[in-house]
Amino acid sequence: MEDYGDRVKFFMSEERKQWHNPETILKNVGVVKGMTMADLGSGPGFFTIPMAKATGEKGLVYAVDTNVSMLNALKENIAMSGVDSRIIEIINSDVSHTGIPKGSVDIVLFANVLHEVEDRQAFFQEVRRISKPTAYIIDVDWKKIKTEHGPPLKERLSEDEAKQVLLENGFSVIKQTDAGPYHYELICKPTCI
C-alpha cells in the first residue's frame, strides 16, 4: 500500500494555499451560512474544511473520494481544524456515483479532478443530479502550462478545453478567473439540456 503521508502534507500545505486559496475561491460564488456543498475528489480536505467553515453549523459538506487513505487523513484534518465533524459527510465513492441526494447541493466543487475523470458524461450526469437548479459549479484545475508540480502537460485541459467540456455536458461558464499562478477557476451554472 502506498504511503500517502508526504502527499497529504503537501496537499494541505501553505505552499499549496499560495497557489490557489480555498477561501478566495469560495468567496467568488458568495457562500452563505447554511448552504449544502459537495467537494468531489476531496482528498485530505484542502477545500472541504474551508467549505465547512464557510457554511457553518447549519450547513452540510459532502466530501467524496475513492482513496481511503486520503479520507482517513481528512478525518484527522477535520479533528485538528476544530470544525464540527457533524457537518461533513465523508463518502468513499467514485465521483460519478456519490449517493448524495438528488437536487440537494448549492455548490459543487471539483478541484484538480476534471483532467482525471475517465467517463465525463457519467461524472457530469452525477453533478447535474445532485445540484439544485440554482447551484454553482466550480471547476478548479491546472493551467495547461509547464509546472514543477501537477499532472503531465498532456493530461491537462486548457481553460478553453474545460469550458467546452462543461458546455457539452450542460453547464454554462458564468465567470472565469485565475486561481493562482498554476490554476484556473471556472464558475458555472446548470443549463437546460
Model-predicted segments: where are they?
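A short SAM/SAH-binding and catalytic strip from SAM-dependent methyltransferases
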Residues: D106-D119
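Conserved alpha-helix/loop element of class I SAM-dependent methyltransferases that forms part
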Residues: K17-T36
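Conserved class I S-adenosyl-L-methionine
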Residues: I138-E161
